[in-house]
Amino acid sequence: MQWKGKRVLVTGSGGFIGSHLVERLVALEARVRALVRYNSRNDWGLLELLPQESKARIEVVAGDLTDPFSTWRALQDCDVVFHLAALIGIPYSYVAPAHYVQVNCGGTLNLLEAARQQGVECFVHTSTSETYGTAQYTPIDESHPLTGQSPYAASKIGADKLAESYYLSFQLPVVTVRPFNTFGPRQSARAIIPTIITQALTGESVSLGSLEPRRDLTYVTDTVEGFLKAAAAAPARGQVINLGTGQSISMGELAEMILKLIGGNKEIVTERHRMRPETSEVWILESETAGPGRSWGGLPR
């Protein structure tokens, strides 16, 4: 796909992956409209950290996915939609599950309907590897069963199925990308790698939840390239595409690796309040990299 001059809407643009995607699209000379959630501070989230020359080339619009009028206005005259906006954070989904359904399912429905009525070249919907639950087999391919092991995962499964239904029912050119765990600059301090690094540098020990879960970790710029390749590939329409490396590491191994790189002999301790409920824990997520992604290039490295 030729991105120069392409009119692109990015929801969730003020978030971690979204801000990197916006930055990359600007570098490719796309005409980027960034949807951010309204706040009284006129704060663009992580877009505020982009270079000034990049920010000057972004059209920022404030709105709310749960308002259908807001999604309609945001999508006007756009060719491509990258839908990344969602309520994330598994712990809070145990506290406010209805809010997760309202935003992740209801908000996605509003955007899909606006895209259907206005017509877009491509709608890239963002899922999550959490929809797989604990792996029934590894590596996990796109046909792996989906399991709602948390209200967050359940809300994303619902959103994924809505996206699928709009492809099958209305021929909306949807592709669903399912990133595994992504890391890199601008990531939330609550994420596992920043959490370990911060404690390794400042604490007397490194306190974590369970050390056993294994995750497939992908650098954020690679994840962004996966988004762009999925949007550009016609064979990806109607498909779910995993974005992962095919390698996993346990949280304990990850902490030991970071401590070795930083230096020091700090103890790694587990704290129960950091753990998920046992039946809600996802013990292993490791992506298959030889599935449908081969037809359109997959991750760059």
Residue ranges and their predicted role:
Residues 1-182:
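N-terminal Rossmann-like NAD(P)+-binding domain of SDR-like oxidoreductases, especially those catalyzing
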Residues 23-30, 34, 63, 194, ...:
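C-terminal substrate-binding subdomain of Rossmann-fold SDR/epimerase-dehydratase oxidoreductases
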Residues 110, 181, 187, 213-215:
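Heptad-repeat alpha-helical coiled-coil signaling segments
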Residues 69-72, 91, 98, 109, ...:
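Residues in well-ordered alpha-helical elements
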Residues 54, 136, 185-189, 247, ...:
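Residue-level signature of the cytosolic catalytic core of signaling kinases
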